[in-house]
Amino acid sequence: MAQVFNFSSGPAMLPAEVLKLAQQELCDWHGLGTSVMEISHRGKEFIQVAEEAEQDFRDLLNIPSNYKVLFCHGGGRGQFAGVPLNLLGDKTTADYVDAGYWAASAIKEAKKYCAPQIIDAKITVDGKRAVKPMREWQLSDNAAYLHYCPNETIDGIAIDETPDFGPEVVVTADFSSTILSAPLDVSRYGVIYAGAQKNIGPAGLTLVIVREDLLGKAHESCPSILDYTVLNDNDSMFNTPPTFAWYLSGLVFKWLKAQGGVAAMHKINQQKAELLYGVIDNSDFYRNDVAQANRSRMNVPFQLADNTLDKVFLEESFAAGLHALKGHRVVGGMRASIYNAMPIEGVKALTDFMIDFERRHG
């Protein structure tokens, strides 16, 4: 079968080694004669899977001991509600940074539970979209927490700064599309959450990292399935968890460790992004509308100078084994999502195709 590279923004490409191992183990996991999908989440066999996955995740991010790791349902949108329901306490407002589509979605959900103070961080630099530096974010005095999205998958915008607002500010962040792609100082955050379907594993699992002093503050109306304290007290098994997604994510964590960990992946991700942006920037045929300082290394949107060629580009790229390059309906054009599992060979195949397509159609 011809090589296919999947540039989907999520569910996204998984490492080939992980898929092959899962295939080998699918019907007879560890000699039990059953699939890991079939065994009880409370049995000792799956408990070992769960514990190893958490420890490997902790190792990869150097998560401090005073942080809890929760394996949850609900995706990022579930946490749009989970964050205010767990962290507001007796306060009625929180600071929300708006820098793109997903940040705005979090704000919309938060309005059901509080009166968010919106920090509009969107700016234009030399005609390109950018984000205000953190030093220009005007935080309010009475906010229960600060929320932002470090990587906007649709807009292709990244906020790479590490927050440093002092110990009194509880920083929360949606790391769904950038978790494990670069070193992360977990100690600068109160809550980090990430849907698994981009850089961790298959859809259906959500990871939450929460500082333990923030537990026990959930609103009385918070659904139990979103209550961090309930989930922590039940080892993320308050109800039946998405066991197969948990298992596969654990395999991805082991794969990441074998690649050299997050620091090694960060270098590879930089190389992939530089290769793709280099082709875009050295061409009048392709265009990216994000300022260099805020360009995402995970999601690279680009436009063709002649958008009547979009359909042809997508058809020919798909035939060449380069799948899921259509941009989000909000922005159009193309988008290449190049998460950890995308090898540099995949990006090279894309850039070679782009150069050839320009030669033939430019």
From Swiss-Prot:
<feature type="binding site">
    <location>
        <position position="102"/>
    </location>
    <ligand>
        <name>pyridoxal 5'-phosphate</name>
    </ligand>
</feature>
<comment type="similarity">
    <text>Belongs to the class-V pyridoxal-phosphate-dependent aminotransferase family. SerC subfamily.</text>
</comment>
<keyword id="KW-0963">Cytoplasm</keyword>
<dbReference type="GO" id="GO:0005737">
    <property type="term" value="C:cytoplasm"/>
</dbReference>
<feature type="binding site">
    <location>
        <begin position="76"/>
        <end position="77"/>
    </location>
    <ligand>
        <name>pyridoxal 5'-phosphate</name>
    </ligand>
</feature>
<dbReference type="InterPro" id="IPR000192">
    <property type="entry name" value="Aminotrans_V_dom"/>
</dbReference>
<feature type="binding site">
    <location>
        <position position="9"/>
    </location>
    <ligand>
        <name>L-glutamate</name>
    </ligand>
</feature>
<feature type="modified residue" description="N6-(pyridoxal phosphate)lysine">
    <location>
        <position position="198"/>
    </location>
</feature>
<keyword id="KW-0808">Transferase</keyword>
<keyword id="KW-0663">Pyridoxal phosphate</keyword>
<comment type="pathway">
    <text>Amino-acid biosynthesis; L-serine biosynthesis; L-serine from 3-phospho-D-glycerate: step 2/3.</text>
</comment>
<dbReference type="InterPro" id="IPR020578">
    <property type="entry name" value="Aminotrans_V_PyrdxlP_BS"/>
</dbReference>
<dbReference type="GO" id="GO:0008615">
    <property type="term" value="P:pyridoxine biosynthetic process"/>
</dbReference>
<keyword id="KW-0032">Aminotransferase</keyword>
<keyword id="KW-0028">Amino-acid biosynthesis</keyword>
<keyword id="KW-0664">Pyridoxine biosynthesis</keyword>
<feature type="binding site">
    <location>
        <position position="153"/>
    </location>
    <ligand>
        <name>pyridoxal 5'-phosphate</name>
    </ligand>
</feature>
<feature type="binding site">
    <location>
        <position position="197"/>
    </location>
    <ligand>
        <name>pyridoxal 5'-phosphate</name>
    </ligand>
</feature>
<dbReference type="InterPro" id="IPR015424">
    <property type="entry name" value="PyrdxlP-dep_Trfase"/>
</dbReference>
<dbReference type="InterPro" id="IPR015422">
    <property type="entry name" value="PyrdxlP-dep_Trfase_small"/>
</dbReference>
<dbReference type="Pfam" id="PF00266">
    <property type="entry name" value="Aminotran_5"/>
</dbReference>
<comment type="pathway">
    <text>Cofactor biosynthesis; pyridoxine 5'-phosphate biosynthesis; pyridoxine 5'-phosphate from D-erythrose 4-phosphate: step 3/5.</text>
</comment>
<feature type="binding site">
    <location>
        <begin position="239"/>
        <end position="240"/>
    </location>
    <ligand>
        <name>pyridoxal 5'-phosphate</name>
    </ligand>
</feature>
<feature type="binding site">
    <location>
        <position position="42"/>
    </location>
    <ligand>
        <name>L-glutamate</name>
    </ligand>
</feature>
<protein>
    <recommendedName>
        <fullName>Phosphoserine aminotransferase</fullName>
        <ecNumber>2.6.1.52</ecNumber>
    </recommendedName>
</protein>
<keyword id="KW-0718">Serine biosynthesis</keyword>
<feature type="binding site">
    <location>
        <position position="174"/>
    </location>
    <ligand>
        <name>pyridoxal 5'-phosphate</name>
    </ligand>
</feature>
<dbReference type="InterPro" id="IPR015421">
    <property type="entry name" value="PyrdxlP-dep_Trfase_major"/>
</dbReference>
<dbReference type="GO" id="GO:0030170">
    <property type="term" value="F:pyridoxal phosphate binding"/>
</dbReference>
<comment type="subunit">
    <text>Homodimer.</text>
</comment>
<comment type="function">
    <text>Catalyzes the reversible conversion of 3-phosphohydroxypyruvate to phosphoserine and of 3-hydroxy-2-oxo-4-phosphonooxybutanoate to phosphohydroxythreonine.</text>
</comment>
<dbReference type="InterPro" id="IPR022278">
    <property type="entry name" value="Pser_aminoTfrase"/>
</dbReference>
<dbReference type="GO" id="GO:0006564">
    <property type="term" value="P:L-serine biosynthetic process"/>
</dbReference>
<dbReference type="GO" id="GO:0004648">
    <property type="term" value="F:O-phospho-L-serine:2-oxoglutarate aminotransferase activity"/>
</dbReference>
